[in-house]
Amino acid sequence: MAQRVQLTATVSENQLGQRLDQALAEMFPDYSRSRIKEWILDQRVLVNGKVCDKPKEKVLGGEQVAINAEIEEEARFEPQDIPLDIVYEDEDIIVINKPRDLVVHPGAGNPDGTVLNALLHYYPPIADVPRAGIVHRLDKDTTGLMVVAKTVPAQTRLVESLQRREITREYEAVAIGHMTAGGTVDEPISRHPTKRTHMAVHPMGKPAVTHYRIMEHFRVHTRLRLRLETGRTHQIRVHMAHITHPLVGDPVYGGRPRPPKGASEAFISTLRKFDRQALHATMLRLYHPISGIEMEWHAPIPQDMVELIEVMRADFEEHKDEVDWL
């Protein structure tokens, strides 16, 4: 059943020059800016008694605003006692270090057992925030840092920060192949035309930019540090595969394990057992959505990636004299 929403207020003189959707988001902080924008486009907002369907319309201050809308009841998700590795928490945000094998949001094939279910158990009031405060995601088997909003105002501002590319996210990865230099992949990404669960570089896709630099060379693999400008689904995985250096272990965009000639049994065994993309969100930097203070967190790579890198490093040292690019 839909919930009726009827709101009235007067635009403050201090809001002179703001976009209508921005002004209303400040006036009604219990509702996200994206929701308010939908109401404006749906002609649910009156300004001085007249319908206004332009979110970008500038306000002058003093206008009488009325909203008459409905909110469809969202799917109800159950709280579940799933441990969360909390790196930081205050009244407005939570930063977690997500493990592998944990989906962020319920969906097809994963109706529960997700970060969202864990958040509902850990902090029940987060149920009042759209999507339980989740503003960005990590793939199921990508580990590392992600930020969650505990309130609607915090969520609104974090989403705006993401859109303005003010949140810095850096990753560590291990890619297949010897890479000679860092660089940037600036290629649009969209759904794969035939494999609907896959993404692909496509000229009609959404803009996507990934910067990468080399941290360490191995014989036939490369350890990378990457920074996202955008946050498309599977972005790093798709971009690295596009430049013919897919991530080790990637079950979708990678290839079969390729140990170098003469590799030890330990190397071969570790590589074959590594059954996820070698990708970890290692650094997160943002401006706090309420205080505006710049904050930064780091999460070391998990043990499975540590072991992978150690066997690759040992193999490189053992066969250094055979490498032709040194």
Curated annotation (Swiss-Prot):
InterPro entries on file: PsdUridine_synth_cat_dom_sf (IPR020103), PsdUridine_synth_RluA-like_CS (IPR006224), PsdUridine_synth_RluC/D (IPR006225), PsdUridine_synth_RsuA/RluA (IPR006145), RluA_PseudoU_synthase (IPR050188), S4_RNA-bd (IPR002942), S4_RNA-bd_sf (IPR036986)
Top EC class, one word: isomerase
Localisation: Cytoplasm
Pfam families noted in UniProt: PseudoU_synth_2, S4
CDD domains membership: PseudoU_synth_RluA_like (cd02869), S4 (cd00165)
Protein origin, superkingdom: Bacteria
S-S bridge residues: none
Main localization of the protein described in the UniProt heading: cytoplasm
GO molecular function per UniProt: 23S rRNA pseudouridine(1911/1915/1917) synthase activity; RNA binding
Residues annotated as transmembrane: none
Alphabetic keyword roster: Cytoplasm, Isomerase, RNA-binding, rRNA processing
Reactions mediated catalytically: uridine(1911/1915/1917) in 23S rRNA = pseudouridine(1911/1915/1917) in 23S rRNA
Gene Ontology terms: cellular component: cytoplasm
Span of domain S4 RNA-binding: 18-91
Family (UniProt): Belongs to the pseudouridine synthase RluA family.
Protein name, UniProt field: Ribosomal large subunit pseudouridine synthase D
Record organism: Escherichia coli O6:H1 (strain CFT073 / ATCC 700928 / UPEC)
